């Protein structure tokens, strides 16, 4: 219940506007303006599509300090004008109080108590930055670097890992495990040789081809900063870059592995020059190293401009927790409007962990095919999750918050304000009982160095000029086992493709080995090398646990297959949690699991070829199947949102079949054409043929052109499904015997199994922007 407080004089600059009564919103907390003067500093930018009350409820929920109204018998014309300008132009009157701003929001009144305002308190600068993001339908995304986007090694870290693997191999008796570790050892040694040639001569031989270092100028990020020119060798076909953190010190040379599918994620974030996300980096690495790694990831500075780079790349101490508040220091974004992409959740503050989408750690040496064999690479999954989060956030903002805000009046109680959207509501944490999207066991040694070693070795290298200590490497402290999330697209590849996911050795069923010389976190992952400990002289009791295919989770914890990412411009209906989120489904042969075979159900088609539109899935949860055997849950929509009334879903299906076919054609790089032909049937006056790269794959005849299109697209999908099943069935039968005889594990065959999966793309924007 509001209660009368006191009067305050309102000024705009030095101009006196009149007096307003200050009504407290809580009897336990009385707010007073200094000297009982309300000095308006400026008016905020116009909200355009966003009313100020909706913005403030999003970034400062229920932070109403007081209410202002006029009790004067004759209303001040200046105050009435201020109220009218703020109300109709979607602005606020801003009072500066130290590090906070008091925003006067012009309110409608049931009792016509004009002028009247609600006063919100927010950190200085936060309102303007969040207003800009909400107007442009933009959120923030924070990336980790090491083992999330890149893996980097120096000569020293390569030598440590090579010696550790040699020690394990010398104690191993199982020839299969020896072969697996030997293959991993060879990968380390090959890259070490590349790095050594680069350090010694500024060139390297790759498969007999001479690659000379090319000078790359690092543009200064601030005035007065000296230009830096680094010798760089790029091997794009291997996602590998050789660079030097400090060009004058050769021992700061680093071999960097860039995670596959990064380009797809990067292009989604900046598609059509319209920012969907403001990008930040939070890492435990040394700053020069972090800046160079990000330059390799974003060479054109499209994601983070040069003038913003110093503020947006945040380096925290290795023993400290990451925090969104520290990332957004200065009030540039509210944590409720931000999500995180990281391979570890526990390195973040507890309050930020619900906003973290966990990706599997990037392991290019331990499991080199873990990325390429997936139907949907890990970073494409992260892109889909980001798309879902953004779509649901603004869906709730537009259709729930803003519609409710329009019904709020000055006389209403503050505690009755509608809840605001929060990114944490849409980043759904996965069942920890299984690893999603082909996640594999963590390797016994980190792929790159960790923690504060980076800065220590850089400083030592600089002091010794040409010392043997490396400059930098994988600098992230990784204190706990990953906890993946279910906001993923299923990788329902054939068993032959799934086999290619594994390292080239069988997994161990033994317990975790003791790894002398490493420190461990609660989750069992090695954190970093202890200073002064040489792992080459340590006694390693056991070889590493090798990777195995993740076990299929219980049916109760699994979502039904199908669905697709929410197109962020579709603005789908929010059902309480994001749809289109799936666990991984790799076949296995352990007792009690589903049998291994080419297809246990027709719906086990590749999800990126056919997937379900979000609205149709909610209205048809039973997963009705078409006559051709394609589950409607697997049809993908790349266009507008579809609505169906009860059983009358024909209109939605028409667009669904056509858009699914176009999606398949786009992913295959094939042209899909609908050609109208003359019908010889008097009743069915329209006839449409579907051509797939010139080949006719379907025909439809109906009384209307729309129905003919639908029928033709549906028949074409059936034809493609039959061809697909006929193609993958022999491949699946070849591997059917192996998993049953080997306790459900799939081994990599001696021949390379090519991944013929269709490349995942960012959601196509073919409708009007949000």
From Swiss-Prot:
Broad class of where this protein is predominantly found: nucleus
SUPFAM superfamilies for this protein: dsRNA-binding domain-like, HAD-like
Tissues expressed in: Expressed in seedlings, particularly in tissues undergoing cell division and expansion, petioles, cotyledons vasculature, leaves, shoot and root meristems, and flowers, especially in buds and organs vasculatures.
Main enzyme class: hydrolase
The enzyme's E.C. designation: 3.1.3.16
Database matches in Pfam families: dsrm (PF00035), NIF (PF03031)
Alphabetic keyword roster: Activator, Auxin signaling pathway, Cytoplasm, Developmental protein, Hydrolase, Metal-binding, Nucleus, RNA-binding, Transcription, Transcription regulation
Phenotype on disruption: The mutant cpl2-2 exhibits multiple developmental defects, such as a dwarfed size, early flowering, small leaves and poor fertility. Increased salt (NaCl) sensitivity. Produces shorter hypocotyls than wild-type plants in the light, but not in the dark. Enhanced accumulation of intronic heterochromatin (HC)-containing genes functional full-length transcripts (e.g.
Subcellular compartments: Nucleus; Cytoplasm
Textual note on the cofactor: Binds Mg(2+), Co(2+) or Mn(2+).
Coiled-coil zones: none
UniProt feature, compositional bias: Basic and acidic residues: 753-770
Cofactors that this protein relies on: Mg(2+); Co(2+); Mn(2+)
SMART domains given in the database record: CPDc, DSRM
Cellular component annotations (GO), alphabetically ordered: cytoplasm; nucleus
Catalytic activity: O-phospho-L-seryl-[protein] + H2O = L-seryl-[protein] + phosphate; O-phospho-L-threonyl-[protein] + H2O = L-threonyl-[protein] + phosphate
Domain DRBM: 656-722
Function field: Processively dephosphorylates 'Ser-5' but not 'Ser-2' of the heptad repeats YSPTSPS in the C-terminal domain of the largest RNA polymerase II subunit (RPB1). This promotes the activity of RNA polymerase II. Together with CPL1, required for male gametes fertility. Multifunctional regulator that modulates plant growth, stress, and phytohormones responses. Positive transcription regulator of genes involved in high salinity resistance and auxin mediated signaling pathway. Prevents the accumulation of intronic heterochromatin-containing genes (e.g. IBM1, At3g05410 and RPP7).
Subunit and interaction comment: Interacts with RCF3. Component of the ASI1-AIPP1-EDM2 (AAE) RNA regulatory complex composed of at least AIPP1/EDM3, ASI1 and EDM2 and may contain CPL2, AIPP2 and AIPP3/BDT1. Associates with the BAH-PHD module that contains AIPP2, PAIPP2 and AIPP3/BDT1 to form the BAH-PHD-CPL2 complex (BPC) for transcriptional repression. Binds directly to AIPP2 and PAIPP2.
This protein's name: RNA polymerase II C-terminal domain phosphatase-like 2
Native species: Arabidopsis thaliana
């Amino acid at each position: 219940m509001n209660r009368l407080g006191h009067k305050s004089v309102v000024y705009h600059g030095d101009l006196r506007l009149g007096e307003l009564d200050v009504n407290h919103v809580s009897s336990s907390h009385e707010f007073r303006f200094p000297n009982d003067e309300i000095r308006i500093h400026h008016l905020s930018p116009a909200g355009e599509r966003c009313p100020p009350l909706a913005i403030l409820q999003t970034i400062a929920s229920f932070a109403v300090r007081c209410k202002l109204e006029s009790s004067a018998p004759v209303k001040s014309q200046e105050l009435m004008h201020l109220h009218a300008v703020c109300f109709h132009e979607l602005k606020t009157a801003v009072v500066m109080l130290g590090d906070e701003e008091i925003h006067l929001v012009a309110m409608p009144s049931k009792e016509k108590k004009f002028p009247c305002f609600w006063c919100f308190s927010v950190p200085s600068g936060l309102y303007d930055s969040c207003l800009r993001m909400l107007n442009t339908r933009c959120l923030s995304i924070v990336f980790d670097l090491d083992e999330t986007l890149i893996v980097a090694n120096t000569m020293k870290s390569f030598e440590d890992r090579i010696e550790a693997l040699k020690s394990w191999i010398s104690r191993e008796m199982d020839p299969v495990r020896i072969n697996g570790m030997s293959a991993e050892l060879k990968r380390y040694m090959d890259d070490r040789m590349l790095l050594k040639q680069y350090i010694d001569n500024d060139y390297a031989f790759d498969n007999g081809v001479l690659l000379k270092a090319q000078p790359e100028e690092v543009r200064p990020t601030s005035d007065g900063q000296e230009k830096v020119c680094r010798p760089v060798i790029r091997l794009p076909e291997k996602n590998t870059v050789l660079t030097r953190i400090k060009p004058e010190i050769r021992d700061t040379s680093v071999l960097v592995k860039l995670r596959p599918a990064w380009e797809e994620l990067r292009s989604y974030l900046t598609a059509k020059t319209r920012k969907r996300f403001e990008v930040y980096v939070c890492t435990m690495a040394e700053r020069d190293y972090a800046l160079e790694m990000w330059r390799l990831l974003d060479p054109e500075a499209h994601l983070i401009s040069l003038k913003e780079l110093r503020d947006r790349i945040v380096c925290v101490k290795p023993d400290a927790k990451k925090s969104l508040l520290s990332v957004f220091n200065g009030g540039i974004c509210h944590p409720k409007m931000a999500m995180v992409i990281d391979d570890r959740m526990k390195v973040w503050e507890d309050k930020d962990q619900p906003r973290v989408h966990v990706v599997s750690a990037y392991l290019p040496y331990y499991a080199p095919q873990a990325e390429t064999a997936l139907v949907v690479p890990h970073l494409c999954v992260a892109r889909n999750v980001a798309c879902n989060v953004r779509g649901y956030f603004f869906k709730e903002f537009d259709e729930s918050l803003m519609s409710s805000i329009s019904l709020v009046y000055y006389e209403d109680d503050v505690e009755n304000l509608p809840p605001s959207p929060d990114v944490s509501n849409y980043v759904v944490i996965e069942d920890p009982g299984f690893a999603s999207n082909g996640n594999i066991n963590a390797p016994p040694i980190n792929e790159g160095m960790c923690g504060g070693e980076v800065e220590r070795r850089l400083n030592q290298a600089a002091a010794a000029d040409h010392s043997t200590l490396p400059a930098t490497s994988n600098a992230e402290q990784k204190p706990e086992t990953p906890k993946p999330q279910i906001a993923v697209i299923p990788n329902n590849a054939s068993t032959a493709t799934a086999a290619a996911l594994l390292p080239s050795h069988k997994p161990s069923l033994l317990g975790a080995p003791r790894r002398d010389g490493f420190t461990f976190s609660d989750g069992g992952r090695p954190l970093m090398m202890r200073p002064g400990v040489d792992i080459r002289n340590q006694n390693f009791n056991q070889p590493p646990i090798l990777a195995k295919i993740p076990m299929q989770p219980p049916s109760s914890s699994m979502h039904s297959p199908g669905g697709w990412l929410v197109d962020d411009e579709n603005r789908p209906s929010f059902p309480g949690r994001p749809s289109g989120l799936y666990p991984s489904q790799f076949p296995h042969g352990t007792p009690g699991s589903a049998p291994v075979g080419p297809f246990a159900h027709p719906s086990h088609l590749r999800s990126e070829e056919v997937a379900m539109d979000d609205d149709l899935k909610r209205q048809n949860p039973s997963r009705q199947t078409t006559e051709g055997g394609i589950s409607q849950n697997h049809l993908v929509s790349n266009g507008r949102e579809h609505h169906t009334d009860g059983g009358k879903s024909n209109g939605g299906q028409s667009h669904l079949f056509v858009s699914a076919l176009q999606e398949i054609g786009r992913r295959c790089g094939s042209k899909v054409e609908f050609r109208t032909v003359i019908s010889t049937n008097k009743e069915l006056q329209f006839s449409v043929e579907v051509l797939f790269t010139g080949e006719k794959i379907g025909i439809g005849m109906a009384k209307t052109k729309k129905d003919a299109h639908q029928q033709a697209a549906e028949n074409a999908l059936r034809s493609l499904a039959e061809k697909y099943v006929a193609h993958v069935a022999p491949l699946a039968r070849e591997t059917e015997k192996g998993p049953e005889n080997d306790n459900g594990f799939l081994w990599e065959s001696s021949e390379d199994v090519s991944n013929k999966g269709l490349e995942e793309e960012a959601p196509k924007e073919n409708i009007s922007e949000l």
